[in-house]
A protein has these predicted regions:
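Transmembrane-helix motifs of polytopic, lipid-linked glycan transferases
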Residues: 104-127
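Perimembrane helix-loop-helix junctions
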Residues: 198-223
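Aromatic- and kink-enriched transmembrane "portal" helix at the membrane-lumen/periplasm boundary
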Residues: 92-93, 132-156
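Start-transfer (signal-anchor) and selected internal transmembrane alpha helices
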Residues: 1-43, 278-287, 329-339
């Protein structure tokens, strides 16, 4: 029934696209509807008690922020489910404004509002804007992110918005502003390790085409900004044994074999050697992410059993939602009209 509703929704939105696109001020109606959804998401966020959830992304972020503000090393602290945080340092900055607003879960509604503003400002056909919002709001994985106060998909959506903004501004030369780009790359890499894959696919070819001075500026800038972003954690480092046992890299990758991690870090570099259009980059990215997630899930199932993988969080199935934003962009958006 669910799939029927989704397919019928897309079918009729396309069928009546000419009528939808001719409606006066339709863009403002879409924005207004999006704002109502935003308010609903805010209400849901405050209505649901995070401590009642069997998902701890929100509390991992909350504990990380609270620990850093209190001058403590965050990766040994326990969240409401008794787990230690795997938040990389940049998530501290993303969640900080919402921590001060009283709930880090507000990140998700505000990222949805940002998507709505992006669609409002873009020159995408009105019916395609509606399809984007329809697919997003009909996605169980996205709605789970809202209800569970998870930051995963919001993290990926922020990355996508940055990549398309950068492509729009510097389409002919991604490395025109190497220092600014190095800051954003360092920031996003320090949110989640998996974002290395899309960043490499989108930017590595441009890095190779840049001159030596630009390359050096980017490398030096990336190194300095990475250190600065990590500084609140670096100044509170405990003893070596604690760091080895409790660190975000260990927590994020403990169930995936090292050879799989290395392989999928290297593959984007090889694919990016070819000159690709932005839609082709998204296509290859979807393939890489899908294979990575499937292989990781299969390995965990083989080692620990299907029940442990699925029901005891040996594999976090919410990571499957990573492909959703890229899938929507690939199948719906007209990339020639993103400016």
């Amino acid at each position: 029934m669910y799939l029927v509703i989704v397919f019928l929704g897309i079918f009729y939105l396309n069928k009546f696209s000419a009528i939808i696109n001719r409606i006066k001020k339709a863009n403002y109606y879409v924005l207004g509807l999006s704002f109502v959804v935003f308010l609903l998401f805010v209400f849901i966020n405050f209505y649901i008690d995070g401590n009642s959830l069997n998902a701890d992304r929100w509390s991992a972020m909350d504990v990380t922020i609270a620990s850093i503000l209190n001058g403590e090393y965050p990766y040994g602290m326990k969240d409401h489910l008794g787990q230690t945080s795997s938040n990389l340092p940049a998530l501290f900055y993303i969640g900080l404004p919402f921590y001060f607003l009283g709930d880090v879960g507000l990140l998700q509604p505000f990222v949805f509002l940002l998507i709505s503003l992006f669609l409002f400002k873009s020159k995408i056909a009105i019916h395609k804007k509606v399809i984007v919002l329809f697919l997003l709001l009909m996605s169980p994985s996205y709605l789970w992110e809202i209800i569970a106060k998870s930051d995963l998909m919001s993290n990926i959506i922020l990355l996508i918005l940055f990549l398309f903004f950068w492509d729009d501004k510097f389409k002919n030369n991604y490395f025109k502003k190497p220092l600014l780009l190095s800051f954003f790359c360092a920031f996003f890499v320090l949110t989640r390790g998996i974002v290395v894959i899309p960043l490499t696919l989108f930017l590595f070819r441009g890095f190779l085409d840049s001159n030596l001075k630009t390359k050096l500026k980017f490398i030096v800038g990336f190194t300095i900004f990475s250190i600065v972003i990590c500084l609140p954690i670096l100044i509170n480092l405990p003893n070596t044994e604690t760091i080895i046992e409790h660190n975000p890299f260990n927590h994020q990758t403990k169930f995936t074999p090292k050879f799989v991690q290395i392989l999928f870090i290297l593959l984007p570099f090889l694919i990016a050697l070819k000159r690709l259009k932005i839609k082709e980059k998204v296509y290859y990215l979807l393939i890489l992410l899908s294979i990575l997630l499937f292989v990781s899930f299969a390995i965990v199932c083989f080692k620990f059993g299907f029940d442990n993988a699925l029901y005891k969080s040996y594999f976090d199935i919410s990571y499957l939602g990573i492909v959703l934003p890229f899938t929507i962009l690939y199948f719906v958006l007209d990339y020639t009209k993103l400016d």
